[in-house]
């Protein structure tokens, strides 16, 4: 259970986890599930009205805009104060997609994509690590994507940010190998969430896949929640959690096929 015996006081202390991107979908469902598992959950959202809604759901709301370095600093300071400098877990889940052919995406759009999906997560994690490393235990879980394993036309910006997150997580895992902190990646394929509401499509963007085909392999947020729960509660969390048949297929095909063959499968 997410409780431990205090070494000096004998008190049983509840473990605290920060979850980002809690306004809906994977973040919200995971936050509620981790609460049911016995964790104290700090639920970070970008909008003040969503933070207020977290309070109504029995969660501790935190205002956090990963695109704003000062907001990240304020949120990290609030988390450290609320946890008395003792944080058990961090679920870096927030993010959004900039979709469209690369020749339609400006430098500013690309920077915003990386700011929200990568730089913000890096800054937040580094600010919170001092509240985790002294205690000899902890979990850092990252929401990546099948697009962190394979790129496709029209999704280059999003895929690039997730590829970066994959490499960063691998490096962090090895750097923390003696700390007791475990690092895991969640790699969802098509999931029914409000994520598509946060997609910033360029004006010449066109659908890059047949939605009818994708729909057949789409799962609900609960498929991801199950993996998140395992990553935070298992004695032996996995390094990577592929979610949906699409992700499992991509992992297998990348091992078996040359790059040009993969291009044909993706692009036709």
Name what the model sees in each region.
Residues 178-238:
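SDR active-site lid
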Residues 23-24:
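Conserved glycine-rich cofactor-binding loop
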Residues 101-102, 109-111:
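Substrate-binding pocket helix/loop in short-chain dehydrogenase/reductase
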Residues 145:
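Residue(s) in the substrate-gating loop at a strand-loop-helix junction
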Residues 64-74, 107:
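The beta1-alpha1 cofactor-binding region of Rossmann-like NAD(H)/NADP(H)-dependent oxidoreductases
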Residues 125, 161:
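Active-site helix of classical SDR
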Residues 103, 150-156:
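Active-site loop immediately N-terminal to the catalytic Tyr-X3-Lys motif
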